Structure formats: structure tokens, C-alpha cells
Amino acid sequence: MGNLFVKKPKITEVDRAILSLKTQRRKLGQYQQQLEKVIEAEKQAARDLIREKRKDRALLALKKKRTQEELLKQVDQWLINVEQQLADIELTSKQKAVFESLKQGNNAIKAIQSEVNLDDVQKLMDDTAEAKAYQDELSAILGEKLSAEDEEEILAEFDNLESLLIVEDMPEVPTTELMPEEPEKMDLPDVPTKAPVASNETTSTKRKVLEEPLEA
């Protein structure tokens, strides 16, 4: 008889790391979708603030959106790397790469978790003391993160968005052809169709004049 008790393979640290990578991949995929919604909300907030003539806050919203878009690019690249590693049949021999990806994944999750709160978008719109403190803190943080090139591109985005809103807010030109107005009808008396008949008095007067003798 064969051995009925088959020894289970030992789970290695690499196996655990691979499982963690898969878990991270799933979480980051969910966070990506949430962050995309936040980015859209930031853009809408910038549009609203431009309409309200609040340039400083609109620029702050666009700056925050820029950093979030950069974070999305980093997460996308990390996910691509993980997919390549998980598809590699020799993955178990690349322990260093696995643990490095796991470390990067943890950092990515921490970074993206702090950016997926839609309530923070509303703080850009509010005028409360709490919102003002948040705006000042965010402005200081973004000032350190963004380069001069980023600042120029954000200003260009602001100008472009402002121009688009001016066009959007213009009154619409009617597309249907205007029909000419019909002239107003006036109630006039009917035109007589027969010659007028003189009265008897008028006829007698004319006859009398004709019958009177002319003076010598």
C-alpha cells in the first residue's frame, strides 16, 4: 500500500509574498476606480470655482488633480510590473523582485488611500475655518511636490478651462429660421362696387341752376 498521508508542500515566504501581491493588485484596482471619480470631482470643482471667480481655489483644485493623475500613472506601472511577475513561471526564483514589488505595492496603497476621499473635494468649495485650514495645508504640500513646469502646465489648463466655460456660458444662437411676421390686418370699410346715387335734394338743386336765365 502506498502512503496515504501525503505531506503538504511547505509554504515559503515567496508563496506568501505572491499571495500578498495578488491581494494588493485587487485593492489597487478598486482604489484606482475611486481615485478616477475623485479626479473628475476635482475637475468639476475647478470649473465651478472659475465660474465663481475664485482663481486661487480653482488653481488649487487643478494642482491637486495633477498630483492625483501622476499617482494613477505610478499605480498603473506597478500593476503592469506585478502582472509580468505573476505570469513568470520562474517567479519563485526571483525572491528579491517579488519582495521589492510587495514593498512598492504597500507604498502605493498608502499613497492612494489618502487621495480617494470625496469629502476633501468639498473642502475646496467651502468657506469654513476647517476648510480654510485644509486649503492652506494642501497649498503648502503641493507647493513642494510640483515643479515649475507643472505650475506652467496647470496655469495653461486653467486658461483653457476658463475659455471653454466662457463659450459654454454664452447664450445659444437660435438654429431655426425666423418666419417673417404677417402684416397686421386693419378693419377698413368695403369698397363700393356701384356708382353712388345722388339724393333727390341734390338733383333738384342742379336742375334749378340749369333752368335759371343767365344775366345779360
From Swiss-Prot:
Listed GO biological process terms: intralumenal vesicle formation; protein transport; vacuolar transport
Coiled-coil portions: 16-90
Cellular component per GO, a single term: late endosome
Chain residue ranges for the region called Disordered: 173-216
Assigned keywords, A-Z: Coiled coil, Endosome, Lipoprotein, Membrane, Myristate, Protein transport, Transport
Pfam families, A to Z: Snf7 (PF03357)
InterPro entries: Snf7_fam
Location in or out of the cell: Endosome membrane
Major site of localization recorded for this protein: membrane
Lipid moiety-binding region (N-myristoyl glycine): G2
Membrane topology recorded in Swiss-Prot or TrEMBL: Lipid-anchor
Keyword Coiled coil attributed: yes
Family: Belongs to the SNF7 family.
Annotated function: Component of the ESCRT-III complex, which is required for multivesicular bodies (MVBs) formation and sorting of endosomal cargo proteins into MVBs. The ESCRT-III complex is probably involved in the concentration of MVB cargo.
Self-association state and partner proteins as the record states: Component of the endosomal sorting required for transport complex III (ESCRT-III), composed at least of VPS2, VPS20, VPS24 and VPS32. Interacts with SKD1.
Protein name, per record: Vacuolar protein sorting-associated protein 20 homolog 2
Organism this protein belongs to: Arabidopsis thaliana (Mouse-ear cress)
Lineage: Eukaryota, Viridiplantae, Streptophyta, Embryophyta, Tracheophyta
